[in-house]
């Protein structure tokens, strides 16, 4: 948690429960209702959705459009004085040149939603927004911070968490005199509003963050309600696999990774949590046989890096699972799959389409 002292106090942390509301019986039109404007989704009627266990083949969730900002003329209330997650006291006086770095791309999506995309000067590979596409990548080997690349950009503010690192890199940036704020978001469906508001407070935009948080929660509630209408009464049994290449980076995502929230958010059963798997368990043949998922979710880059579906099926144990036998693999863009930011509702709805109504995806 962050203690923020400024003229405008830290935006109220709003703990909103995600609950299901009534959905239309015949068709669910998931328009942004003038609130976001960046996506419109239509799910078929429940009577038009077949048995998802009869669906075969790989399905891909496409890249999302950039988030619509709540303002195009943000005016941060600075300075902001805070104590970050590592216990350092930081004064944020300038948000004109921001680097926002995390494994999931959550921070750049949130800052874009707050109207600060023009202030972002670099990115990680997970920040895939079109508006940021021409910015330099300041990570190497996936998600290792390149300190030299960071300092060369002369940032006025670095926002980061320990989902990337190493910790020594963050220490070096701080030691170079760059105001550096280490965050500690929860990254769950229920914490979306809180996480947005905490970041908004850091950059001096608490009111804008509250608007973005409210909009995001409304979208999540609406979309989860719609998903409930088409999800089967007998839920699909699913795992989230994390893969990079054909070596040892091949894990079943478990407790604390966000996979449970994502899978349960679309009305499926997360087999990893059902079997009390820890943060990331090796996806060996024994573990896969024990879980025997009916569908597998992966990051798009993960499936590509392992050689596509052909390469994945060569992995010990995959072809023997129900998911492998039916090639029932769903991929989500790397920068969106576990971000749990302001595009969470869209992530859930697009994943639900891929699971239950691929013709609508």
Which residue stretches match the model-derived regions?
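His/Asp/Glu-enriched short active-site or ligand-binding loop at hydrolase and phosphoryl-transfer sites
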Residues: 253-279, 331
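Bacterial Sec-exported substrate-binding components of ABC uptake systems
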Residues: 2-26, 31-104, 207-238, 357-361
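Short helix-initiation/N-cap motifs at beta->coil->alpha
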Residues: 138-147, 186, 276-284
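Short secondary-structure boundary segments
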Residues: 102, 162-163, 242, 299-303, ...
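Structured C-terminal subdomain patch of bacterial secreted/periplasmic proteins
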Residues: 195-198, 291, 295-361
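Proline-aspartate-enriched helix->loop->beta-strand connector
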Residues: 146-163, 178, 284-298
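A short, structured surface patch at a secondary-structure boundary
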Residues: 64, 97-151, 157-162, 271
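Extracytoplasmic ligand-binding site segments that recognize negatively charged/polar headgroups
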Residues: 166-169, 185-198, 232-258, 304-307
